Curated annotation (Swiss-Prot):
Positions of the UniProt region annotated as Disordered: 1-22
Sequence similarity: Belongs to the thr operon leader peptide family.
Low complexity bias spans: 7-22
Keywords: Amino-acid biosynthesis, Leader peptide, Threonine biosynthesis
Pfam families per the UniProt record, alphabetical: Leader_Thr
Gene expressing this chain: thrL
Taxonomic placement: Bacteria, Pseudomonadati, Pseudomonadota, Gammaproteobacteria, Enterobacterales
GO biological process, one term: threonine biosynthetic process
Name of the featured protein: thr operon leader peptide
Function: This protein is involved in control of the biosynthesis of threonine.
Length: 22
């Protein structure tokens, strides 16, 4: 389950960065 949480955090960070840059 920790792996899922870590992956979700990475995806969220990437999404936020992309959204902000876009």
């Amino acid at each position: 389950m920790r792996n899922i949480s870590l992956t979700t955090t990475i995806i969220t960070t990437t999404d936020t960065t992309g959204n902000g840059a876009g």
